[in-house]
Amino acid sequence: MTQAQARQARLEAWQARFGRIGALLADFGLDEASFLDGLDQVKHGCRQAWLAGVMTGFNGNLSLRLGKHLMLVTASGIAKGHMEDGDAALAKMDGSLLAGPALSSETAMHVAVYKARPEARCVLHTHPGCLLALSVKLAGRLGGMLDMPLFEAAMWRPKLAIAGAFPPGSQELADSVGKAAEKAPAVFMEGHGLCTAGTSLAEALGVTEQMEHLAEIQLRLI
C-alpha cells in the first residue's frame, strides 16, 4: 500500500464512523489532507506529553486550530498516550461539535483561551506532577510558584498566571482561565493542572515542560 493509499484508508475509516467531511471542510476553506495532517499532530502532541509525564492515563486534553474557523479537539475519556484517529473530533471555534466523537469536557476552556490569545494555534491542558505537588506545598501562597533566584525562573515566572479553583469542565473554570490567559501563555489552575497556549504544538508543549522543570527545582529547595 502506498502512502497515499494508506492516508485514504485512514480517512475512509474515520468517515465510516463519523460521516463524510469533505464538503464540510471545503465550506471552511480546508481539505481532507489538512484534516489528516491535523490528526497526526494531535496524536503526536498527546504522545509526546504522555512520554514527558505531563499527561497520564485519561487526564488532560489538547486542541489544534485548523485554519481560521475550525479546530481538532481530543475526545472525552481517551488514553492520551495511545491515541487513534477516531479519538479526536472536529469542532468550530465556538466549541460546537461538527463531526467525530464526544468533545473533551474542557472544550469551553480551549475556546476561552483562543479568544484571549488570538495568535494561538494549539492549547494544551495537562496535570504535571511537580506543579501540582508544589501547589499543595504552597497552599495559600500560589503567588510564590516558581519564584526563585534563578535567571531561568526570572524569565519564565512572568509567563505563568494563576486561575482560581473551579470544578473541572465548568464555565466558571473556562472563564477564569480565559481571563488569566490574557496575561500569560501558561495558566495554573488551582487544585487542577496547567493550561498552555502556543503558536504551534511544539511551543505549547515546550512551555508546559519548562514550567514543570522549574517546579521540580523549587520542590527540591523547599
Residue spans for each PLM region:
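Glycine-rich flexible loops
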Residues: 1-222
